[in-house]
Amino acid sequence: MTAREAAQAEPSPVGILQLGVAFWGSKTLLSAVELGLFTELAKGGPMPAEALGDRLGLHRRALRDFLDALVALGMLQRDRAGRYANTPEGDRYLDRTKPTYVGGILEMANQRLYPFWGRLTEALRTGQPQNEIRDGDPDFFAKLYADPARLEGFLRAMTGVSRPTARVMASAFPWRDHRSLADIGCAQGGCLAEILIAHPHLAGIGYDLPPVRPVFEAHMREQGLADRARFTPGDFFADPMPQADVLVMGHILHDWDEAQKRKLLRKAHAALPPGGALVVYDAMIDDARRENVFGLLMSLNMLIETPGGFDYTGAECQAWMRDAGFREVRVEHLQGPYSMAVGLK
């Protein structure tokens, strides 16, 4: 073996170093979203670096490095003439003018989560949230729900995140066997809308806190579903859940500690008729806790954001659902890091 071959055979630190500075790439994407780069390219089409920089008000010093880094990260395309353009994914999901926009959640990550995650070490040592609560500010969500404009923006962002999973769920669950569903913690109603559009025989209920009503009802009108979906206000811990053949809980359970998770599952079971179903979907961690990186990191994000929330495995969710009285419980992968747990009453 030559010296070169011997050196190449040694373990390399490259992977460690790349992961250690992975925030470089994350922040590059988040800044691009903040600047509206993808929206500008969707509007103006492919353009050279200088023209794009002028439109975005960027200094020339690092302009090409910034754009070419996005090319290398797979977030932009560059043709032989040196013009930059959106990828198909960027055009669909990062253009603010499109209903498929998911950048709202990235905007929140940039403004809030990025600095909060700088306190992860403290969170790991104390077990305490590192968001606004840490600094003595009012709870983020209390302020959010008191500000109609900000609330609408947040709920639209959640729709962008949930829509792809909802479309898969619309075909993965036997909706033909049921006549009604209620989305618990419905936000704008994006998940509910996707299912109702795919299954015209269904009637839907959106269940969330009272300030959500105008945003939900506006979205149902936009989707042509105002006659098939109604809003029921309520607090799912303090009030009874609405009655429907199917209850859906998406991105809900991971916000809470185990006792609260179990309470919500018991309340869902009590609200369902015999033969009714509960569908829970989240970024469920694989049972071996080795593969679903997003789910595991999301659980760390719950440490940053909540007093007791955590993400969970499919096996854990099934056990909680059985303890709450559900039968024929199963877990089914949907798409990406997301899976659903289904149980019958």
Description of each model-found segment:
Residues 6-7, 13-43, 54-179:
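Conserved Class I S-adenosyl-L-methionine-dependent methyltransferase catalytic core
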